[in-house]
């Protein structure tokens, strides 16, 4: 289908079939469409509203072109859409560190900041972690520690074709939705935070289509009326849970798990160095209660998604024990040491 027909279909407000979306995305990623055409397609898709079928089609196209890595399908990815503009510190990254120290295998897919002051790649780098290890080094790190960070540009090189267009457009597009879905390790267990409650249904359908084994899709609100793509410490957290094809929905509050309420301002972060300092304080036990509780709440959900915890309450106990025993700080320091050794090893091979 030529670009003109694709554009005409979107102008008429019609949805693409999965096959049409695969064709469209293949042409974009293979450089067969000009930047002007790509911009028009992305803007029209966004105006019409992206469907689960279109998202699944884009997923299949991008995963076909991705540099995939074989780790462990049962590893957990903690990844959010971003875009909530709440300015919280890197909670899901912190949770991945604590969960890993509790025995959860982590395959975290992430990138530098897009909508926030500090993305997962930025804060890990500030903590001393080499984010751009080659895949074979990342595999070694995972085998030794059960932790992997998958830096998106390394595994999705074709995405560089759309980066200038996305920057120039300056609006959310289908690519903002795709980020949490296109984990190059094909992780089948995911904790996904979304900035808009309407996206929960879309993610549910796409995760079911693409074979998620267990997933939690989370959207929350603060008492101040701010939307969050992570659990809330002072308002409702809406959850859609997927487990072997079965979908359940529920809403929880921090006090359901014995957590105190904290205002949004208490869990807001800043630039990469500030957020790295917050994570270090959480790990060494010197953090304020709000920072600690935000990390524990998300970690509890990651432990539950992994199957290590029977429920969120159980996950909270597991997370708290790992953190308060010093296990989390010790394990993360071990990860940093292995990461540095692998960075030196593979740099010397390249040189």
Swiss-Prot record:
Pathway: Amino-acid biosynthesis; L-tryptophan biosynthesis; L-tryptophan from chorismate: step 2/5. One of its GO terms (molecular function) is anthranilate phosphoribosyltransferase activity. Anthranilate 2 binds at residue 166. Its EC number is 2.4.2.18. Its cofactor is Mg(2+). One of its GO terms (cellular component) is cytosol. InterPro entries: Anthranilate_Pribosyl_Tfrase, Glycosyl_Trfase_fam3, Glycosyl_Trfase_fam3_N_dom, Glycosyl_Trfase_fam3_N_dom_sf, Nuc_phospho_transferase. Pfam families: Glycos_trans_3N, Glycos_transf_3. Binds 2 magnesium ions per monomer. It catalyses: N-(5-phospho-beta-D-ribosyl)anthranilate + diphosphate = 5-phospho-alpha-D-ribose 1-diphosphate + anthranilate. Anthranilate 1 binds at residues 80, 111. Keywords: Amino-acid biosynthesis, Aromatic amino acid biosynthesis, Glycosyltransferase, Magnesium, Metal-binding, Transferase, Tryptophan biosynthesis. Belongs to the anthranilate phosphoribosyltransferase family. Homodimer. HAMAP family: TrpD. Catalyzes the transfer of the phosphoribosyl group of 5-phosphorylribose-1-pyrophosphate (PRPP) to anthranilate to yield N-(5'-phosphoribosyl)-anthranilate (PRA). This is Anthranilate phosphoribosyltransferase.
